[in-house]
Amino acid sequence: MRKPIEHTADIAYEISGNSYEELLEEARNILLEEEGIVLDTEEKEKMYPLEETEDAFFDTVNDWILEISKGWAPWRIKREGNELKVTFRKIRKKEGTEIKALTYHLLKFERDGDVLKTKVVFDT
């Protein structure tokens, strides 16, 4: 789940899920929707360490933003042992706001029962 939050940044959300992977999926959805990305069918894969920390989340999402700038968008996220396999799809077109980076501002994982949540603030 995600909901926009008021912030001085152009794009900020509170996101939640039952797992670290679900938080990453929400971040991916924000990137795809805010940037207005239309995907093609050509794919490539990339592996990421599965470390359920704010630092790893920050690094992973910012790497995705770099990949988007190169014409590839994260599409599928799958846990494989102690790594995450992310399948990227070639970007056909972008019609939204360019996101430059995820910031550390308000990025703090919190557990509420089975729900993991944080806030994400993006620079545009």
From Swiss-Prot:
Pfam families: Archease. Transmembrane segments: none annotated. Ca(2+) binds at residues 7, 10, 123-124. InterPro entries: Archease, Archease_dom, Archease_dom_sf. Keywords: Calcium, Metal-binding, tRNA processing. Coiled coil: none annotated. PANTHER family: ARCHEASE, PROTEIN ARCHEASE. Activates the tRNA-splicing ligase complex by facilitating the enzymatic turnover of catalytic subunit RtcB. Acts by promoting the guanylylation of RtcB, a key intermediate step in tRNA ligation. Can also alter the NTP specificity of RtcB such that ATP, dGTP or ITP is used efficiently. May also act as a chaperone or modulator of proteins involved in DNA or RNA processing. Belongs to the archease family. This is Protein archease. The lineage of its organism: Bacteria, Thermotogati, Thermotogota, Thermotogae, Thermotogales.
